[in-house]
Amino acid sequence: PQWSDLGMFLQTFMLLAKEAGLDTCAQEAWSMKQDSVSQFVKSDAEDMLFCGMCIGYKDNEAPVNNLVSERRPIDEWAQFL
């Protein structure tokens, strides 16, 4: 489906924002609040909420903005043929 291409779009948007000196945060959790968000933004019933994204300037002093999560090695979750 078309929405499956959104990941590449979001990544490209985020890279371009970074190049322009902006920080971003993609937030898939918005999709779990489809009804509330749809009411707030007055979207059509057939629209699907995939995710949200924050864009702006991060506060480097805020501890949450310096969190680095643990990553599994790529060979544990991907196979390249």
Tell where the protein language model's regions lie, with residue ranges.
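Small-aliphatic-rich amphipathic alpha-helix that forms the alpha element of a beta-alpha
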Residues: 1-40
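C-terminal helix-cap and adjacent tail motif
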Residues: 45-81
